[in-house]
């Protein structure tokens, strides 16, 4: 059996590359994957799979004609918060695959935000005709329940991704705290400056080594460099920028970290899975969702983020002054807890329910 895997792959985003790695890890051995990628050569070399250009309609249609199944491979594909084109692209391909008679799976999805009526209609239509659907958060499951679409609810598959060691990590000073930020309109220049000041104060008070982790370097590296420059100016302590391209190494990085401050959804997943204390800075309902599900402390950059997720008061607003940020982090660093081994094992075991969905849908008993 051949299956076309469709996601935000080959775009340099560590979280989506981790989803692809987890999908390939969980895919039944009898399935030959064909990956739609923004960088087919890189995807092919990294994962030893066939990869084709995601924007080449002729190549995509040819791949569908040669395949038996089509899989939305994890993440928040059907959302129009970043671009109205996302639902059109992913939803259009799903409908095309269904018209062509392929078996279709929406795998480990986070649905929404869907602000436009067309996005809502297209998502509902595409999901209605899928042979199997799994989602990674309760809000997505609740939406599908409203649409009378049955689905499997399980933690993000990256909980189950294998980790790999990171060369040189253990040579860095300890203890270590990771910071994984991303650009967003709500992370204004003033807020970023406040955050950098708070990190410098936090580092001076604790003596930690700060690891700045750009999950999508083309977008996140500038923020990491801004913070690194501020830490250098303040002479607050050792820091290191880690731009890792291997998803398993990205996850392995958090094995050597005591605490993570994360905007990136998969930074929080990976850190929590590796027994690290996590502090969320939310810009999106998916970050609100994991913070609520794991009872993580944190702040929301925008009240709209919590309202959209239905948890208006779960995360308090981002503070306006650096002393408040620093004090909150110091309290959490001193007194906060990571997930227990039993909690981590439970999340990991349940994440493999996505693997069961693949096997049962592609090869029904």
PLM region descriptions:
Residues 1-365:
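Active-site anion-handling motifs in enzyme catalytic cores
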């Amino acid at each position: 059996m051949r299956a076309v895997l469709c996601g935000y792959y080959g775009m340099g985003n560590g979280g989506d590359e981790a989803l692809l790695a987890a999908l390939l890890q969980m895919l039944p051995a009898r399935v030959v994957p064909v990956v739609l990628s923004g960088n087919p050569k890189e995807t092919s070399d990294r994962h030893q799979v066939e990869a084709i250009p995601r924007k080449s309609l002729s190549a995509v249609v040819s791949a569908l004609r040669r395949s038996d199944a089509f899989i939305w491979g994890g993440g928040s594909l059907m959302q129009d918060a970043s671009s109205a084109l996302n639902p059109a692209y992913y939803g259009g391909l799903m409908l095309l695959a269904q018209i062509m008679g392929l078996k279709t799976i929406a795998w480990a999805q986070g649905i929404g935000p869907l602000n436009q009526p067309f996005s809502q209609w297209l998502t509902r239509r595409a999901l209605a005709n899928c042979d199997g659907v799994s989602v990674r958060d309760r809000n997505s499951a609740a939406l599908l329940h409203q649409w009378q679409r049955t689905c499997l609810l399980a933690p993000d598959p990256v909980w189950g991704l294998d980790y790999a060691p990171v060369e040189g990590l253990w040579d860095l000073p300890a203890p270590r705290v990771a910071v994984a930020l991303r650009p967003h309109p709500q992370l204004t220049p003033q807020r970023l400056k406040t955050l950098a000041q708070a990190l410098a104060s936090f580092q001076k008070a604790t003596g930690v080594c700060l690891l700045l982790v750009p999950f999508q370097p083309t977008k996140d590296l500038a923020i990491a460099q801004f913070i690194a420059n501020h830490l250098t100016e303040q002479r607050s302590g050792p820091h290191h920028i880690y731009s890792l391209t291997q998803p398993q190494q990205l996850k392995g990085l958090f094995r050597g970290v005591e605490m993570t401050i994360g905007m990136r959804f998969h930074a929080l997943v990976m850190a929590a899975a590796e027994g690290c204390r996590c502090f969320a800075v939310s810009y999106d309902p998916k970050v609100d969702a994991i913070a609520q599900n794991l009872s993580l402390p944190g702040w929301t950059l925008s009240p709209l983020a919590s309202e959209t997720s239905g948890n208006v008061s779960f995360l308090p607003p981002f503070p306006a002054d650096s002393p408040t940020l620093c004090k909150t982090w110091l309290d959490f660093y001193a007194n906060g807890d990571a997930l227990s081994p039993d909690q981590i094992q439970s999340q990991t075991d349940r994440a493999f329910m996505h693997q069961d969905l693949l096997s049962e849908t592609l090869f029904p008993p």
